[in-house]
């Protein structure tokens, strides 16, 4: 696992390829330590990968625009790549948890880690601002830039039980046979216990109403260390200083 993690950190994606794509769509030059990820056309996560974690020979993958997690299995290399993962299986979050937002609303998962038989996941928790579009005039784009929204599922911090399926591969379940259950931090589509606590923080509180892309509050990573959670922040960056939150 440590070797896989180091290789993953070197990163990873000279290409993303679904089995239906032709080989001529792949880059002509492959980088050293490349890892090949193969996704079916039905996979919940196929692009915009934002988080990854290992369980043995399997790789859990999350994406910016998905409301679910895909599990890829380690396969024999088919070319010059160092590692290859495919044979995916999708796990919609709505089948595992009562979500704060709608079942089809993106969760923007940004951090994943495996600890004590659970897959921990965290959303960005950030607001988003509408972007300009080339086919709109200045007045329309000005209105778009003034619109700030929140997808409720972004405010998700949860742990999902990992259990071996009948095929011997790890699966995510709502409730495991040993009694472990999927759980999420208490809250709704507007806030949770984390955002309520941060709102009173002198450093981060003033940034809770600012979209993530504008240096607002924006979670980007997650580590479980015993009884502590370490949450990495993409923003805000304060005078060049980034931060970790310890829970």
Indicate residue ranges for each PLM-predicted region:
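Intrinsically disordered, low-complexity segments enriched in small polar residues
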Residues: 2-5, 20
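Sequence/structural signature of beta-propeller domains
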Residues: 26-247
């Amino acid at each position: 696992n440590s070797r896989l993690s180091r290789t993953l950190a070197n990163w990873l994606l000279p290409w993303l390829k679904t089995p239906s794509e032709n080989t001529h769509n792949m880059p002509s030059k492959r980088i050293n330590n490349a890892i090949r990820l193969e996704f079916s056309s039905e996979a919940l996560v196929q692009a915009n990968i934002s988080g990854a974690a290992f369980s043995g020979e399997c790789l859990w993958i999350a994406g910016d625009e998905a409301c679910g997690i895909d599990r890829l299995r380690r396969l024999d290399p088919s070319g010059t790549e160092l590692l290859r993962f495919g044979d995916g299986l999708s796990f919609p979050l709505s089948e595992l948890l009562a979500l704060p937002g709608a079942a089809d609303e993106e969760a923007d998962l940004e951090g994943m880690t495996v600890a004590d038989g659970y897959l921990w996941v965290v959303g960005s928790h950030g607001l988003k601002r509408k972007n300009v579009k080339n086919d709109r005039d200045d007045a329309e784009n000005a209105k778009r830039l003034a619109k700030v929204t929140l997808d409720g599922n972004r405010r998700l911090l949860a742990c999902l039980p990992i259990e071996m399926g009948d095929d011997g591969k790890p699966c995510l379940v709502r409730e495991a046979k040993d009694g472990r259950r999927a759980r999420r931090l208490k809250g709704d589509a507007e806030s949770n216990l984390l955002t309520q606590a941060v709102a009173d923080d002198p450093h981060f509180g003033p940034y809770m109403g600012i979209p993530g892309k504008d240096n607002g509050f924006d979670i980007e990573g997650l580590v479980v260390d015993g009884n502590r959670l370490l949450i990495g922040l993409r923003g805000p960056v304060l005078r060049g200083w980034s931060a970790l939150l310890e829970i």
